[in-house]
Amino acid sequence: MTQNPYDPLKRTDLSHREQVLLKFTAEVVHGTNLALIDTLVAPDYVQHTHGVGQGREGIRRYVTEISMRRAGREQWRPLLVFEDGDFVILYKLLPAFMIVDIVRFNAEDQLAEHWDIVQPLPAPGHDPMELSQHDFSRFYALFGVPRQG
């Protein structure tokens, strides 16, 4: 795997909210510590991920019914995390997917609102830190653009 100069696990300057999101992701989403939901997540948590319910109970149900039963759930690594105002963005790699989580925090530093983007890896063993090469094949297929020439 290509060295990641932005690796959140090696950074010493993480903000409090970046640390909270990493803890939540590691211990709740990819772990088994459901008790953290009651302290790290706002009671009126808003979920924008289609199919996942609202509030703490929505997260709890997703983790117990889906996340805890997902193959390879513990095999993940954060690639990038950054804070901008009330938002923290986490880019992470799983065995078959890349995911971007966008989280808004409330004044109590709890997760208050969530969006995500899930993308299958373009190829098995894909290294997202490796420099890209010119090959539009996946874009032709993804966007339905006819090839020229």
Model-inferred region functions:
Residues M1-G149:
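C-terminal and inter-domain tail/linker signature
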